[in-house]
Structure formats: C-alpha cells, structure tokens
Amino acid sequence: MTSRNETLFQRAQKSIPGGVNSPVRAFRSVGGTPRFISRAEGARVWDADGKAYVDYVGSWGPAIAGHAHPAIVEAVREAALAGLSFGAPSEAEVDIAELICELMPSIEMVRLVSSGTEATMSAIRLARGFTGRDAIVKFEGCYHGHADSLLVKAGSGLLTFGNPSSGGVPADFAKHTIVLDYNDLQQVEDAFRARGGEIAAVIVEAIAGNMNLVKPLPGFLEGLRRLCTEYGVVLIFDEVMTGFRVGPQGVQGLYGIMPDLTTLGKVIGGGMPVGAFGGRRDIMEKIAPLGSVYQAGTLSGSPVAVAAGLASLKLLREPGFYENLGARTTQLVTGLAAAANDAGVTFSADSVGGMFGVYFSAAVPKSFADVMASDRDAFNRFFHAMLDAGHYFAPSAFEAGFVSAAHTAADIDETIAAAREVFARLG
C-alpha cells in the first residue's frame, strides 16, 4: 500500500521542483521517500502517516528549546493578535537587538533580516563597502547561504548532490572568491601575502557544520584574526548555525576570538524566519540610512518572528540550560560511539554544545578531505535503519545534527538502544 508520505511526495514533484523547497529535504543523498511532517512537539516529530520520530534535525538547528515550546507558541500568538506585519519599526525589534548586543561579545550594532542567506550576503556587501576591496576568502565545504559569490565549493546541500559549486553563478562573480582549505592556516597566510591588498573579508563557519561537524584546529581562528588585523581585512564569523547553539556566546565566546562581523539565524528566530548581522560600530554605521551600503527588507524585523526569537533567547538564559543541553548531546555521541565500537563498525562522533557530528570513519574529521573520505554508503544504511526505528537524523552525511533541551536522558537511551541493533546488523 502506498504511504501518505509517498503520495504527498508524488504530488509535490508535480508543482515544486524536486518536490521540496530546500534540496537536502528530498533524500536524494540517502535515497528513499522524504518524510512529510504533520506536527512536532518537544523532541519528536510525526510524519504524514502518523509515525513518531525522536528528532535530531530540529528544523536544521532553530528548535533548540524543542518543538512547539509553550513560551514561544504563546509569544507568537500574542504578537499575531497585535498584527502580522507593520513595515515600520516596533519596540520588539529594539528589544531583540539590545539582547543580541548584550549576549554576543563582538556585536555593538545589529541589523535584522529574514534569513541566514540575507545575513551573510549583506555582511559581504558591507565588508566590501567598508574596505573598498572586492575579493572574499571562504573555505571549501563551508556553506554561507545561496548568494552567488558564496556558492563556490560550498558544502552542505551542494555536496549532497555531488556538485561542489552551483550552476548559474557567473564566472565574473566567482573570480572574486578565493577558496581555501579549512584548518590550513599556512594556505591562508600564502593567499594574504599574494593578494592581501585585494581582500575585503574572510568569512568562515568558525565551527563548520555544513560538511558535517568539523572543529577548528588550535591556532586556526587565532591566525585568521591576526592576519585580518594585519591586512585590514574584515573577519566575518558565520554563526548562523552555531550562534547560541554551541554556547551562550557562540563560537566567539567559546574560543575568545572577536570577529569584526557576525552573521546569525536559526536559534534567534525560535523557528520563525529571522537572520541578523552585526559587529563593530564603525563598520555597521556604513549601512543605509547612515552610510552608502544599501540593505533593506519588507519583512525584516517581522513582529511575529521577532516575538518568537525573543522568547527563544530568554529561554536560553535560564540557569543550567547549556549545561543540560551539552550533557544530553555528550550522552548521545558517547553512546553511539560505544555501540558502534562494540559491533566492530568503523565510526566516530563529536559534539559541541547542542550540535553533533557522526562519521563513518576511524577518526573525527579535521578537514574537508577527511569528511569526503568517510564511508557514505555506511551512513546511508545507518540513516534508513534508524529512520525505520523511529529516530530522525539529518538525511545527508554532510550535515551536523542537533539536540534540544526537550530531549531527555530516556530519549537518548532509546536512540542508543536502536543504534546498537542497527550497528549489529551493519557490522
């Protein structure tokens, strides 16, 4: 009998390219039929056939407090009753801007947008306007949204389909993008010596999450900061994924390294479409209406989305929030690694805060090349077996996973028990 998921996917493919509104959702990397989600609550999602899953996708990061958290739902309800969109400033915009500036150590001023892509696109434009230079340094496997100049060896969904770069990006745009290897500081130093006077910005996922989870090697971020300061280059930390996810001050708080600009998204929207970019006051004052760098958006600062974001950020400030989140995530990765080891399966796992990576490789990857050398076929078999058992991991070997505050120790134990059975079959 055809499942409701299959029926919906067949319908969707007739009116939506690939049947999805973001490519990784199509399950092309892992094969099979994507799950159409009908509802979500706490640590679980339910598909169109009524099957429940312990969820480790978390809407790709935003659901840090769990799905449909009552405080966030109530904040959205109250805001919606007062009006869905004004196209004018509101007090809530000021509230969330002040809170972001208070929480993020490098941000002195912040501009709200409606997505992470808008945030990184605007930050790049601002860096170019501020420096008067054109070239941008990015790192292979790091994804910064789908702006043309950043869709070069961009990881994430592009890797899922075997294409490191996107069609439709003019060579004239791409020529200003210098792509280097993540965690290779010597390569960055060489590029700066050769072209330092042309470089407007270095943009980096300070902890990579779009080629699975890859942490910076000791000295890498410090070296980027040193070189950018020396050459007058704007250092941009893309914390769309890691901001408020890996800790209360993001990666910059964990490592004590201050970028010039930071891009945010996901968690700051509480599940609604919100992004932001912010940083040094002297740079941010170049944005219109104060300066010549133009940026605008009809729904930027949406009162409903901002209400969700404010409620989400307030939850993160509760005592013990990050300690408990980190404990659950550590429980998951250590349990999965132990289960794989007991079954003789080549496997490793890593985590930071509420973010984790699973790899079918003997060691945790330290580079894009390491990630590409992992066993993707083994991951695909693991993914489907866990999905059948009611545990929803990201449908790609190149995506990080997420734990929420709603996950209990019992939820994690249930996942580890299922994984033990799966690894026994894989071994």
UniProtKB/Swiss-Prot annotation:
Q: Which Pfam family name is an example for this entry?
A: Aminotran_3
The answer on whether this UniProt entry bears the keyword Isomerase reads: yes
A cellular component term from Gene Ontology for this protein is: cytoplasm
Write out the catalysed reaction.
(S)-4-amino-5-oxopentanoate = 5-aminolevulinate
Q: In which pathway does it act?
A: Porphyrin-containing compound metabolism; protoporphyrin-IX biosynthesis; 5-aminolevulinate from L-glutamyl-tRNA(Glu): step 2/2
Q: What GO terms are given for molecular function?
A: glutamate-1-semialdehyde 2,1-aminomutase activity; pyridoxal phosphate binding; transaminase activity
Q: Which cofactor does it need?
A: pyridoxal 5'-phosphate
Keywords tagged on the record: Cytoplasm, Isomerase, Porphyrin biosynthesis, Pyridoxal phosphate
Compartments, record wording: Cytoplasm
E.C. designation(s): 5.4.3.8
Gene Ontology biological process terms in this record: protoporphyrinogen IX biosynthetic process
Which InterPro entries does the entry mention? 4pyrrol_synth_GluAld_NH2Trfase, Aminotrans_3, Aminotrans_3_PPA_site, PyrdxlP-dep_Trfase, PyrdxlP-dep_Trfase_major, PyrdxlP-dep_Trfase_small
Please indicate which superkingdom the organism of origin belongs to: Bacteria
Class in the EC hierarchy, top level: isomerase
Q: Which residues carry this modification: N6-(pyridoxal phosphate)lysine?
A: 266
NCBIfam families recorded = hemL (TIGR00713), PRK00062.1 (NF000818)
UniProt family annotation: Belongs to the class-III pyridoxal-phosphate-dependent aminotransferase family. HemL subfamily.
What is its quaternary makeup?
Answer: Homodimer.
Q: What is this protein called?
A: Glutamate-1-semialdehyde 2,1-aminomutase
